[in-house]
Curated annotation (Swiss-Prot):
A Pfam cross-reference name: PemK_toxin
Gene3D superfamilies per record: 2.30.30.110
Top-level taxon of the source organism: Bacteria
Protein known as: Putative uncharacterized protein YifN
Molecular function via GO: DNA binding
Length: 149
């Protein structure tokens, strides 16, 4: 169910990014522009909210992934989140995740919902220091590091 509130900075939510459209000749179409195209983010994923008050219908989020990209980690575009930072969830294993700041995007609140725990729904924000690391990684990802040096 979509959220009907303004999420806080650092709040962890679940986002349904959708899937790639299937073509008749292969696994997905790269010429269908009314949907996702590789390498854009897909699937249901955990995200960290960086701005929940863009307007009444949208948020800026950074997706979380369990796939490590060593090159982007070294370049400061991905931020490691230890396995014990995010509370235990019903559909997401408790494991090391990476905030993929190079994939920051605005999404509709209709794509966002609270992740399910075993006894309800997650209501958690990341620690302020970790959110600041993710924000710096976004700045690096858009090649604006000179603004903070």
């Amino acid at each position: 169910m979509a959220i009907n509130f303004s999420p806080k900075v650092g709040e962890i939510l679940e986002c349904n990014f959708g899937n790639y459209p299937v073509s008749q000749n292969g696994p997905f179409s790269t010429t269908y522009y009314d949907g996702r195209i590789p390498p854009e983010m897909i699937k249901n994923r955990l995200v960290v909210v960086l701005n929940g008050k863009i307007n009444g219908n949208a948020c800026i989020v950074v997706p979380l992934s369990t796939t490590r990209d060593q090159d982007k980690l070294k370049r400061g575009m991905h931020v490691e989140i230890a396995s014990n930072v995010i509370n235990d969830l019903q559909f997401f294993d408790q494991q090391i995740r990476w905030a993929k700041a190079d994939l920051v995007q605005q999404v509709s609140r209709n794509r966002l919902n609270r992740a399910r725990t075993y006894r309800g729904y997650l209501n958690q924000c990341l620690p302020h220091e970790l959110v600041a690391d993710i924000q710096r990684a976004v700045i690096k990802s858009i090649n604006a590091i000179s603004l903070i040096n």
